[in-house]
Amino acid sequence: MSKVTVVGAGNVGATCANVLAFNEVADEVVMLDVKEGVSEGKAMDMMQTAQLLGFDTTVTGCTNDYEKTANSDVVVITSGIPRKPGMTREELIGVNAGIVKSVAQNILKYSPNAILVVISNPMDTMTYLSLKSLGLPKNRIIGMGGALDSSRFKYFLSQALGCNANEVEGMVIGGHGDTTMIPLARLATYKGIPVSKLLSAEKLQEVVASTMVGGATLTKLLGTSAWYAPGAAGAYVVESIIHNQKKMVPCSVYLEGEYGESDLCIGVPVILGKNGIEKIVELELTAEEKELFAKSAVAVHKTNEALKEVGAL
């Protein structure tokens, strides 16, 4: 019997749980939220689609009852608040760090062997906080960001090529932010053909730019953060772990010298399997890509410093 818990039954968490159920990734999915009745109601709503959609996964909800999350194989953390107008980066980190730290500690009381998938923002920093505050092996703490950014990159590539997104390969590394992510256009392919041979340099740069502001574009259109793709990206990461698929997925993981960086969590390609991070894959980067990655790492380190400023670490 496999079990996944999703903490936070908001838009992203509920979407993640729904995708996990629909794809029958686990036998049981538990949603936990602090708001009375929300996770229970959404779980019931999802279960009423089981006959319509043909899935056998059991989805349940609970209000702050961590005992019901016991013996989870993977736990997805989506908890936290969005940045409000006038709120500084440090204030957002201060609030969300407290929430994520508390959630992670409570989860481990009942699921000491769980693998954690962090979606809460700022994602690289919350992944780093979870790792440092819990003292778990680094293979068990994974930030989802690169999976989402890469999916957005493939979407924009497919739009430019006029093809199906499933026929495109593309990868985004670096920090999960609109100035820190690095879409690797050089390595993108369509049916094995380098995209650089199919699109002009100008068009490819447009795709890269659109990818980098992908989240902000959706926030502007929706009036809030996106949820379908982030939730699905979280479920995609979980599926590779639960089913031991050994997929190569860019995720935010703790580096100890890889890519010339240490003591931070940042997006790089990893092999995901039953142990979480099975392997960090080191790509041969160009001088320009190395420079961009180093700049991205500096920005992530700077955000991590705020954890000390607010007393979270």
What are these regions (language model features)?
Residues 1-4:
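Extreme N-terminal starter segment of soluble prokaryotic enzymes
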Residues 9-10:
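Glycine-rich Rossmann-fold phosphate-binding loop(s) that bind the pyrophosphate
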